[in-house]
Each structure stands twice: as C-alpha cells, then as structure tokens.
Regions:
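Sec/Tat signal peptide C-region and signal peptidase I cleavage site
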Residues: 34-39
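Solvent-exposed, acidic/polar segments of extracytosolic/periplasmic ligand-binding ectodomains
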Residues: 42, 347-402
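Extracytoplasmic "Venus flytrap"
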Residues: 45-64, 86-93, 115-116, 182-190, ...
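Beta-alpha junction/loop-to-helix N-cap segments that form part of ligand/metal-binding clefts
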Residues: 56-61, 71, 75-144, 156, ...
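Venus flytrap/periplasmic-binding-protein-like
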Residues: 88, 135, 142, 212-213, ...
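Extracellular/periplasmic Venus flytrap/periplasmic-binding protein
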Residues: 97, 142-145, 150-251, 286-297
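Periplasmic-binding protein-like
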Residues: 102, 106-115, 135-137, 178-183, ...
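Extracellular/periplasmic periplasmic-binding protein-like sensory domains
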Residues: 245-318, 329-334, 382-402
C-alpha cells in the first residue's frame, strides 16, 4: 500500500470517527431534550389582553412582568430567560390558538398570565395536557379548582369565589339584611356571585347578569333604583367598572344604596375615577399599602416607572414572575414537574408575603377590607381597613384529585 493510500485510509477513518462522535453527541442531546444553549434558557409565554378596551389591564400586567425581570437581572432562577408576550384579544378561540403556538412552536417552559376565566377554560386542557406548566396571574374559574383540576396548573392569584366570599362575610357581620347583586354574564361573574352568597345569609333582592364588555348601565341603574336595596354588591372589572361607578355617581345612587365591590375599583379604574370613587368599599387579597419589603419595592418602582399606582392585576403578574424565578432556582431547572413540586410546597415570595398553597395549587391567603382614600399627594388609592379572612382556602379544593 502506498503512503498516499495509507493517508487516505487514515483520513477516512478519522472522518468516520468524527462523524460518529457528532451523531452520538446529537443523540445524547436529543435524549436530554435540548441543546445546552436551549436548556440553559427559561422561556415563558405570557398571555394577556393588550388590545381593545381591556388592553389597559393587560398593559399593566406587561409593565409588571418587565419590572419583575429587571428585579431578577433579566434571569429566572439564575438562568437566562426569555418572555414572549401574546395578545389574546379577549377571545377564547384566539387564546386557544396562541396557547397551542406557544407550546408546540415556541416550545415555552411555562404559559402564564390570562385575565379572563372563559379564556382560561379554553386553554387549560391544551396546555396542561402537553405537560407544560400553566400559571394563572388572574383567572381562577371554579371548574379547574375542583374536579377539573390538573397538577400542571398553579394559581398565583386566587380562586374566583375567594374574594367575594370576604365581602359576603363582611356584610353578614354588619347586619345587612338584603342585597342587590350584579356581575357580567361569564364564568368569573357567576363564580363571584356564588362566592358572595356562600357567606351572606340575608335576602338577595335581585341577581343581575350584564353583558361582558358592557359600558351603558342606565337600564340596570333604573331598575336598581326602583328596588331601593340597602346595599348593592357588584363585580365589574376594568372599563366596565369605570363606566358603572361614573354612572352610579351621576345618577345619585349613593342616596339610594351603599355600593360594595370586588375587582371594580382598583389601580386600573382609579386613575379615571379619581375622587369619584372615594369611600367605596371592596375586598381584595392585595393592596398597595401592604407592609412587606417586596410589596414596597414593587409599588415604588412601578410608580416611578409609570406615574401611577399598580393594580392588583399588576401585582399578581409580578408575583407570577417571582414565583417562576423561585421555582426554577429551587428546582435547578425549568422542568414542569420539578417547578410545580417547588410551588406546591408554598413559601413563595410575593407582594402579599410568603404564599401558601392549597392541595389544588390555589393560594391560601388573607382577604382584606379596603376603602378608597386620597394619599398624601391627593391621589386616589386603596387602603386596608380590616382583615375579613386569614389564611382563607377556596371552597373547591376537596373536589380536586390529582
């Protein structure tokens, strides 16, 4: 054999060995699920409403996510991170399409966000059954808290019934005998009124469901005036709440009935309502004046960046990202099973303080009584005036069997 033939043979052998090494390397990376670059990056698909009248809510949530990422140095659990924002347009079919894209095409580790309960119902099965972690920043519909629960779902907000249960208990304790109640006609609206009725034992004079997205409440207010209820309880989030409270005041309804709310008068609506909403009472699991270090930092930085108080939507969006940061850091990876195991243990750092988790992976938390007041600068905000429930659990956890 000539020298040239020997060298050629050696080169062929080396090429074959190199090729085999490459294939073995690719095979190992395939078995591990990703290349090192991808494995070291946590990818979050954040779904919220960024367009239309409800876009004001989604933009606050987006602002809060960005502040959270600033606070974590652009990383989650010490790993490089990427957040993909998507606009669900407040449409269930759009939300479902986006959820499938995030899971199948973008291959996110976590799908988070979601304001509306009907949208959460649309994406819950497609996401959780793909073995992707789904973390709610707001929506907490009752079907997925009970028999329809799934181990890949975690709430960083509340179960829909929890907060209005606080208002029902408060009015019961105040000796109120009868109430007129109202909410939009969708899953969350039904849950809110169910929660209120669970703890209020007096007479329900009327249970009214309005159209989701409704802006004109003159007909409802006229009927309410004729009923002359001593108390009125409403759930009208976002722009619906702004219009309802303005029309309530313009119609002089304060002389007819005392107004009580949940998720209606907050950091979304107060910049528009200003002192119109002074004195309105609500229940909530969060308030900008909660006295803990994380909340103070978040509220201060949000106000500095955006010139207004954050809403509870923003606080929950911030808490969601801090929960992911905590879960990835403790688990050492963005593996869904590892992250949910960390979150299920509780002790999650949030603007509400360390958060405990129920067996259905919804929070166990306080429900506060709040009043709209003016701060030292004359800006309308909410102030905690009492605690209705301590370490409050939702009503559906016992039905949840993972």
């Amino acid at each position: 054999m000539s020298l040239v033939q020997k060298l050629a043979g050696s080169k062929i052998k080396l090429k074959l060995e190199d090729t085999m090494k490459k294939y073995v390397g690719l095979l190992l990376m395939g078995l591990m699920g990703a290349s090192p670059a991808i494995a070291d990056t946590v990818k979050v698909g954040y779904m919220t409403t960024l367009s239309g009248g409800a876009g004001i809510i989604g933009k606050q949530m987006q602002n809060a996510v960005n502040i959270a990422m600033e606070h974590t140095g652009g990383k989650l659990g010490g790993m490089e991170a990427e957040v993909v924002f998507v606009d669900d347009q407040r449409k269930p079919d759009v939300a479902k399409q986006l959820a499938n894209r995030l899971v199948k095409s973008d291959k996110v580790d976590v799908v988070a966000g979601v304001i509306w309960s009907n949208l959460m119902m649309a994406i819950h099965k497609p996401v959780t059954r793909s073995d992707t972690l789904l973390i709610s920043s707001n929506a907490g519909p009752s079907p997925i808290a009970g028999a329809g629960c799934h181990e890949n779902f975690v709430s960083m907000s509340w179960q829909n019934d929890q907060t209005p249960e606080g208002m029902g208990k408060h009015l019961q304790s105040q000796g109120v005998k009868s109430v007129y109640i109202m909410a939009p006609n969708y899953q969350a609206g039904k849950d809110m009124l169910a929660g209120f009725k669970r703890h209020f034992k007096g007479e329900i004079l009327a249970e009214v469901y309005t159209k989701l997205g409704q802006t004109d409440f003159q007909a409802e207010l006229s009927t309410l005036r004729a009923a002359k209820p001593p108390a009125t309880f409403i759930f009208q989030p976002g722009g619906m709440g702004i219009n309802f409270v303005k029309q309530w005041k313009q119609a002089g309804m304060d002389s007819v009935s005392k107004l009580y709310t949940v998720f209606t008068v907050d950091g979304v609506s107060l910049p528009a309502l200003k002192d119109t909403a002074l004195g309105v009472i609500s229940t909530q699991t969060w308030s900008p004046d909660l006295d803990n270090a994380m909340n103070k930092r978040f509220v201060s930085d949000y106000k500095a960046a955006h010139g207004a108080y954050p809403s509870f939507y923003a606080a929950q969006a911030y808490d969601t990202m801090m929960a992911i940061d905590h879960a990835v850091g403790e688990a050492g990876s963005a593996d869904a099973a590892a992250m949910r195991a960390v979150l299920a243990k509780g002790g999650i750092p949030t603007t509400r303080g360390p958060l405990a988790m129920n067996t259905n992976q919804f929070p166990i938390q306080n429900v506060y009584l709040r009043e709209v007041v003016l701060d030292n600068d004359g800006v309308a905000t909410t102030k905690v005036i009492g605690t209705v429930f301590e370490n409050h659990k939702d009503a559906y956890a016992e039905e949840c069997k993972f």
